[in-house]
Amino acid sequence: MPEGFRCGMVAIVGRPNVGKSTLMNALVGQKVSITSRKAQTTRHRITGIQTTDDAQFVFVDTPGFQTRHATALNRSLNRAVTSTLTSVDAVLFVVEAGRYGPDDAKVLSLLPRETPVILIVNKVDRLDAYTRAEMVAVFLQEMAQVFPFKEIVPMSAKNRDDILRLLGIVRPYLPEGEPMYDPEALTDRSERFLAAEIVREKVFRWTGDELPYSSTVVVDKFETEGRLRRVFVTILVDRDAHKAMIIGAKGAKLKQISTEARMDMEKLFDGKVYLEVWVKVKSGWADNEAGLRAYGYE
């Protein structure tokens, strides 16, 4: 590695649905964290790795901090957020441009004062083009009074130039040192884990507002033979009615979920995928501490 090479961990935090996973995928240059317009899409800490000529960035995408429903699942998600903050070199605190409310403030109150915090003002591209510059300027002034941020970065996670600029801003906050991961690595998560996340993303996209939060995905079997993967998964739901919603009329919705998931897996794994998806009812799974640990939650 060249002299002055830097390597460190950077947490991406914020309230649900501010674009944390989209930002991480853009920073890594590959889809490693699932996205959805619905809140609570991310349920696990996902590590994304970006290695450049002079640095390795290890980004940790955390679940959005949950303040409204005191289930065992949401307690698990919040533990994932708070435990991450104790082990990183810098924090990217993500808010939506023009919007800062009680849920954002709750997350900000958890951030350690001794760790550099960089404010990411995301989704500036969604503001009205005629008033954008003025609105952003006012919002940045307001946010500068809220917390001693090391940097304040207005941007869009969908803009490649903004992403490159952000990497340059973050690099000085990483300690000098050897890379933690192979330069070709994109994530520390297994293909088995990523397969479950991809199926869960499709459930989020193809079902109503209530259902995603009462469902999870379990990989029953994951086999690799050359470039072929055989993946067998079960979608667990809370009620019979939810099972019917996922399956859809004559199995149409389940087929759509399965087809899109298989295509995403083939793109990510760079090979053919045989995918079988089943739906089962397991009442109360989201409020069972022992069961959640068995499904990989903290």
From Swiss-Prot:
The species this protein belongs to is Ralstonia nicotianae (strain ATCC BAA-1114 / GMI1000)
Q: What is this protein called?
A: GTPase Era
Q: Where is this region: G4?
A: 122-125
Q: How does it sit in the membrane?
A: Peripheral membrane protein
User: Cellular component terms, GO, for this chain's entry?
Assistant: cytosol; plasma membrane
- Where are the stretches annotated G2? 40-44
Where is it localised?
Cytoplasm; Cell inner membrane
Q: What is the lineage of its organism?
A: Bacteria, Pseudomonadati, Pseudomonadota, Betaproteobacteria, Burkholderiales
Concerning HAMAP family, the annotation shows:
GTPase_Era
Pfam annotation, one family: MMR_HSR1
Q: Which residues form the KH type-2 domain?
A: 207-283
Which stretches does the entry tag as region G3?
Answer: 61-64
Question: Which residues are GTP-binding?
Answer: 14-21, 61-65, 122-125
Q: Name one GO molecular function term.
A: ribosomal small subunit binding
Question: Which terms does the UniProt entry file under GO BP?
Answer: ribosomal small subunit assembly
Region (G1) residue spans = 14-21
Oligomer status and interactors: Monomer.
